[in-house]
């Protein structure tokens, strides 16, 4: 895969996450019932960063959980008829909370749908909202993020690659060609 372009550097990522933090606080009139849930792998450090930015605004940090939806995905090969869920505990209570799912890139919407199914299995949230660092289009399901860092129209042959310090040792977003 060859890199076509760098679309976000470290400062652009920070600015987008700060804006998303402000939008979450504003839309929910504070963070009283807000819980952030990062979708592994890169959604988790993004959720933690957003929580830190929210704490600068509100004076306290919202709870942050993590969700591994690989066992819930409907588009995985079906080697097993029903995958076994080893652990459903995401580390935070979602009942009657405003759950903000955080992920790096939204594409078809299938990952988000699977994440919503997993959250609902854990309890009945007051609402589920979606924060994405990058929206690349090409949705296959009627899912739209509430908070978007950057809209990047892509072709289906392109890949958006988010790299974060916590996972990859660098902060940037690039477009690569398959």
Swiss-Prot record:
Motif (PRPP-binding) on chain: 99-111
UniProt catalytic activity: UMP + diphosphate = 5-phospho-alpha-D-ribose 1-diphosphate + uracil
EC id: 2.4.2.9
One BP annotation, GO: DNA-templated transcription termination
Matches recorded under Pfam families: Pribosyltran
Molecular functions (GO terms): RNA binding; uracil phosphoribosyltransferase activity
Top-level taxon: Bacteria
Listed CDD domains: PRTases_typeI
Entry keywords, A to Z: Glycosyltransferase, RNA-binding, Transcription, Transcription regulation, Transcription termination, Transferase
Binding site for substrate: 41-42, 103-111, 136
Gene3D superfamilies given in the database record: 3.40.50.2020
Family membership noted in the UniProt record: Belongs to the purine/pyrimidine phosphoribosyltransferase family. PyrR subfamily.
HAMAP family assigned: PyrR
Function: Regulates transcriptional attenuation of the pyrimidine nucleotide (pyr) operon by binding in a uridine-dependent manner to specific sites on pyr mRNA. This disrupts an antiterminator hairpin in the RNA and favors formation of a downstream transcription terminator, leading to a reduced expression of downstream genes. Also displays a weak uracil phosphoribosyltransferase activity which is not physiologically significant.
Subunit organization: Homodimer and homohexamer; in equilibrium.
Protein name per its UniProtKB record: Bifunctional protein PyrR
Organism of provenance: Caldanaerobacter subterraneus subsp. tengcongensis (strain DSM 15242 / JCM 11007 / NBRC 100824 / MB4) (Thermoanaerobacter tengcongensis)
């Amino acid at each position: 895969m060859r890199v076509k372009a760098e679309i976000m550097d470290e400062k652009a990522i920070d600015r987008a996450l700060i804006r998303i933090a402000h939008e979450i606080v504003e839309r929910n009139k504070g963070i009283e019932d807000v819980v952030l849930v990062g979708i592994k792998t890169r959604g988790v450090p993004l959720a933690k960063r957003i929580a830190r930015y929210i704490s600068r605004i509100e004076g306290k940090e919202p709870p942050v959980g993590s969700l591994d939806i690989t066992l819930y995905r409907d588009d995985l090969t079906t080697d097993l008829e029903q995958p076994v869920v080893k652990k459903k505990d995401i580390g935070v209570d979602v009942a009657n909370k405003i759950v903000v799912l955080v992920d790096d890139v939204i594409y078809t919407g299938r990952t988000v749908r699977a994440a919503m199914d997993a959250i609902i299995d854990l309890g009945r949230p007051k609402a589920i909202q979606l924060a994405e660092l990058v929206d690349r289009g090409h949705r296959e399901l009627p899912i739209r993020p509430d908070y978007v860092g950057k809209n990047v129209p892509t072709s289906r042959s392109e890949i958006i690659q988010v790299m974060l310090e916590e996972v990859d040792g660098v902060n940037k977003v690039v477009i690569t060609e398959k």
